[in-house]
Amino acid sequence: MESVAYILVLTMALSVIFFAIAFREPPRIQK
C-alpha cells in the first residue's frame, strides 16, 4: 500500500500547487 500513499501525497502536492497558481493569478474565466 506504499504506492497508494505515495500517489495520494503526490496528488495533494499537485493540488496545492494548482490552487496556489489559481489564486495568485487573476481569474480569467468569469461564470
Curated annotation (Swiss-Prot):
InterPro entries for this protein: PSII_PsbT, PSII_PsbT_sf
UniProt KW Magnesium keyword: no
Keywords: Membrane, Photosynthesis, Photosystem II, Thylakoid, Transmembrane, Transmembrane helix
Membrane association type: Single-pass membrane protein
Domain of life: Bacteria
Keyword Heme: no
GO biological process: photosynthesis
Subcellular location: Cellular thylakoid membrane
Sequence intervals crossing the membrane: 3-23
Main location: membrane
A Gene Ontology cellular-component term: plasma membrane-derived thylakoid membrane
Pfam families: PsbT
Subunit and partners: PSII is composed of 1 copy each of membrane proteins PsbA, PsbB, PsbC, PsbD, PsbE, PsbF, PsbH, PsbI, PsbJ, PsbK, PsbL, PsbM, PsbT, PsbX, PsbY, PsbZ, Psb30/Ycf12, peripheral proteins PsbO, CyanoQ (PsbQ), PsbU, PsbV and a large number of cofactors. It forms dimeric complexes.
Family, as annotated: Belongs to the PsbT family.
UniProt function note: Found at the monomer-monomer interface of the photosystem II (PS II) dimer, plays a role in assembly and dimerization of PSII. PSII is a light-driven water plastoquinone oxidoreductase, using light energy to abstract electrons from H(2)O, generating a proton gradient subsequently used for ATP formation.
Identification of the protein by name: Photosystem II reaction center protein T
Organism taxonomic ancestry: Bacteria, Bacillati, Cyanobacteriota, Cyanophyceae, Oscillatoriophycideae
